[in-house]
């Protein structure tokens, strides 16, 4: 929101029945300008309708994966097909769940739509996600099914050498199941989907959220192709270089190729692109706007696993808060840096204040 919109919201909070001409007199602007600002506030979801009923905080709906993450780190650099000493860690995970968890840490109202099995993992995931502050009433428990699981093996340098993602359960998150949350989704300030969803579920989300800003996490180059025909519906996209190649349809061998690919996606309708690079820097591009590279701030790094989920949560948060494009990018990079400073997928010290304290370093 801009300063004028904030002034109008403050007036409406004090007197929801005030007339537009009275607001105009108070702010010394024309009534038509007041009407235009109010229309903008309604489009942004800050005002629900006549009588100026205010939405105190827009909420986000995340549609995506919730799964158990099992991560093993071998004590050697090149693990072979044998048993190796090392450490194994289990935690709540899933791209959608992790982003929702981070949004809750940042103080946003967030709902998660997903599916779990009726096993121990499913119960543990629901409880931990609920404790984090995420509304999980839209997570459906499927009887006789096993909860999705992600298994990753890393070497002693914390480089993932093998990962297996068993998310077959998500195939049962059908439009029929999702229909129970259609009203919740229709009134969201932002909808975020991850590409673990089936093509049918993605179609349901894109169709129902046609008038709502859509954020998409491509997840991997194996799943990014699912959204190639939905680019015109996407507001914000965060691909890696391999994922960008899939969406563009050509190899990227230089910065010039990357820029051309980004512009091609803009031409197809994507408003904001944040290309996550191997060195943790981010190439940021706004349609008909700025293009720049941001590097990660100097900050403690314990584990990079999950930092991109912190980044995406930062993008959603800053969009809902009305940040500029550049400030949104800087805030998201700061969130990613805080995420890397913990061995946990969701750093419990992540907060809006802590991220803002790092922004000047970005």
Which role does the model predict for each range below?
Residues 1-20, 26-27, 32, 36-55, ...:
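Conserved phosphate-binding/catalytic region of the ribokinase-like
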């Amino acid at each position: 929101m801009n300063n004028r919109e904030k002034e109008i919201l403050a007036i409406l909070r004090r007197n929801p029945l005030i007339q537009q001409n009275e607001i105009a007199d108070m702010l010394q602007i024309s009534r038509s300008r007041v009407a235009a600002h109010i229309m903008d506030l309604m489009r942004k979801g800050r005002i629900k309708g006549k009588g100026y009923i205010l939405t105190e905080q827009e909420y986000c709906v995340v549609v995506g994966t919730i799964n158990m993450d099992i991560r093993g780190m071998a004590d050697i650099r090149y693990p072979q097909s044998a048993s190796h000493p090392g450490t194994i860690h289990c935690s709540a995970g899933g791209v959608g769940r992790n982003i929702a968890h981070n949004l809750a840490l940042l103080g946003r109202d967030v709902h998660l739509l997903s599916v779990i099995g009726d096993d121990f993992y499913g119960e543990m995931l629901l409880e931990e996600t609920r404790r984090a502050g995420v509304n999980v009433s839209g997570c459906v428990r499927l009887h006789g099914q096993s909860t999705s699981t992600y298994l990753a093996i890393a070497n002693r340098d914390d480089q993932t050498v093998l990962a297996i993602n068993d998310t077959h359960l998500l195939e049962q998150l059908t439009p029929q199941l999702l229909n129970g949350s259609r009203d919740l989704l229709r009134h969201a300030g932002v909808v975020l989907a991850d590409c673990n969803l089936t093509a049918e579920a993605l179609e349901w989300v894109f169709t129902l959220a046609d008038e709502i800003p859509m954020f998409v996490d491509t997840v991997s180059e194996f799943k990014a192709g699912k959204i190639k025909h939905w680019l015109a519906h996407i507001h914000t996209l965060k691909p890696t270089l391999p994922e960008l190649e899939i969406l563009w349809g050509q190899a990227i061998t230089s910065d010039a190729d990357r820029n051309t690919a980004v512009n091609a996606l803009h031409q197809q309708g994507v408003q904001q692109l944040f290309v996550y690079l191997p060195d943790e820097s981010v190439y940021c591009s706004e349609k008909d706007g700025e293009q720049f590279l941001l590097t990660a701030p100097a900050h403690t790094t314990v584990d990079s696993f999950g930092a991109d989920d912190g980044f995406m949560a930062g993008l959603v948060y800053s969009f809902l808060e009305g940040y500029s494009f550049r400030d949104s990018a800087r805030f998201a990079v700061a969130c990613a840096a805080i995420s890397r400073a913990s061995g946990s997928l969701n750093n419990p010290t992540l907060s809006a204040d802590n991220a803002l304290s790092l922004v000047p370093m970005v």
